[in-house]
Amino acid sequence: MTESKFHAKYDKIQAEFKTNGTEYAKMTTKSSSGSKTSTSASKSSKSTGSSNASKSSTNAHGSNSSTSSTSSSSSKSGKGNSGTSTTETITTPLLIDYKKFTPYKDAYQMSNNNFNLSINYGSGLLGYWAGILAIAIFANMIKKMFPSLTNNLSGSISNLFRKHLFLPATFRKKKAQEFSIGVYGFFDGLIPTRLETIIVVIFVVLTGLFSALHIHHVKDNPQYATKNAELGHLIADRTGILGTFLIPLLILFGGRNNFLQWLTGWDFATFIMYHRWISRVDVLLIIVHAITFSVSDKATGKYKNRMKRDFMIWGTVSTICGGFILFQAMLFFRRKCYEVFFLIHIVLVVFFVVGGYYHLESQGYGDFMWAAIAVWAFDRVVRLGRIFFFGARKATVSIKGDDTLKIEVPKPKYWKSVAGGHAFIHFLKPTLFLQSHPFTFTTTESNDKIVLYAKIKNGITSNIAKYLSPLPGNTATIRVLVEGPYGEPSSAGRNCKNVVFVAGGNGIPGIYSECVDLAKKSKNQSIKLIWIIRHWKSLSWFTEELEYLKKTNVQSTIYVTQPQDCSGLECFEHDVSFEKKSDEKDSVESSQYSLISNIKQGLSHVEFIEGRPDISTQVEQEVKQADGAIGFVTCGHPAMVDELRFAVTQNLNVSKHRVEYHEQLQTWA
């Protein structure tokens, strides 16, 4: 009989004999021959009347002797049957010491209930995320199937929720920008949107509650010598099971080929943000699990022997790796050298998962790790498949405008660039082939190649730039592997009659490709492109794309925030001709201004404005002028992106039409 059935039967018998003023229980004993002798409280006590019960209750010794004699008879019967197992039901109730029995009953109930509740609460955490995903999937389907319905959500109530819940940063403006806590940026971090923060906070609170609910000390618990040993064991079981439930989920959210991206409409950056928070909570649960189990085992004297067992050694390996992941994944390290972080991260995750499997398999929870491994393996197989079918191609890689890499890769006929999308590039160089970097596509007139751009920063882009710098034209042919395409255009083009694309610096390629793609498909929409750059030289690496805008109905404006800085304009000289005047006192300065003038003439379809734009005023004007729903799509410097988000939230009620905001900035590092 299982413990749960035992307790259920016990409670039933107790209820039957409450009227007699005594407390009985069903007990199982073994005869000397090894056969089971079952004794039970007789239901016939009700028919025999209260006199029998009162005799039993008033003479405890009599009850015991009666039981003893019956047991002896049963034992003899067993011998008489040549050792065959016989069972005899004793109808005389047994009087037990209920005060001594209660701690055993309560202790085993607490232990069993803790396991059951841990599984229920772990399922509850998964159910919470399933609910969030279900809502996101439903909302995404409605947007795609009924775009006009979305446009009708522009009333005061809808705008109230969007202004204070759905669109804004958690604290005033900063979302793409990191929050600096000082100490040389070591504790800097990113805080998501207000809605995302609420989702994360609820998850953290639920996890904290589920880790402690229905755990309490059982007085005189016979299982543990001390209260610390008892509570430590209960908390360790609870947090360990909760942490195990979350592992497949955090692996799923961290994959590039997460099918949920297409169902929910969330971008990779959103899933990565949730991946990080679930991982942080999960590792903290595992650390609490390890600490509380150690406290319990030391209190009971089992620590040294238990730590010699294989499953505990592997559990220790997994916990240590989880702790290093938690520390090493801080924004400070990701920003300093993302490629190094990523390689170390993968190695630590492998040991975390393998160690977790060998720790959990003997405890009956190994299937959770198999689920995590299956999710991870699926992502890797798809990624390798994308790379294999694209093939190793010779790419032309060059430095443009001193701070930008341009990569041109011949592509297979089946491969189509996604407007606003990106691909991961593996450079087949001895020190670089294990690393990959996301590059954003841009639209070109040629259909036989992919053109991608990336700002030169630390890590792989810096290494490529150093390799190209001494070469003629800062250009070389490098064999590459391409993994992609990833991403998709925003829904602004589907939902809005007016679309304003705002790019800052190197955020232009994806914004440009989405803008041009929309212009090719639409004839009745108002499409504007605003590009904010610091220097004139930034135009040099994007001249061809800007010239192509002549063929579209896109209204283009370029802001040059530091127009007085004319350095680096020599890169234009092979494209734009001008006549030098040797009789001028300052021929260099004259040449620069002449060149700028010629650039403007060559791009006469583009409006050039010198100075920094007032984004708030710009947004207000665009919203007031819109004759229908208007959407702002942006990518660029985090400060600019945050400023635009804030301006949109402040102007939702300026027009009777719907105002949307779409952020294409992918913050992975």
UniProtKB/Swiss-Prot annotation:
Membrane-spanning residues: 122-142, 198-218, 234-254, 281-301, 313-333, 340-360, 499-519
SUPFAM superfamilies reported for this sequence: Ferredoxin reductase-like, C-terminal NADP-linked domain
Region (Disordered): 17-86
Keywords: Electron transport, FAD, Flavoprotein, Glycoprotein, Ion transport, Iron, Iron transport, Membrane, NAD, Oxidoreductase, Transmembrane, Transmembrane helix, Transport
GO annotation (BP), single: intracellular iron ion homeostasis
MF (Gene Ontology): ferric-chelate reductase (NADH) activity
Family: Belongs to the ferric reductase (FRE) family.
Name assigned to this protein: Probable ferric reductase transmembrane component
Native source species: Candida albicans
Encoding gene (name): CFL1
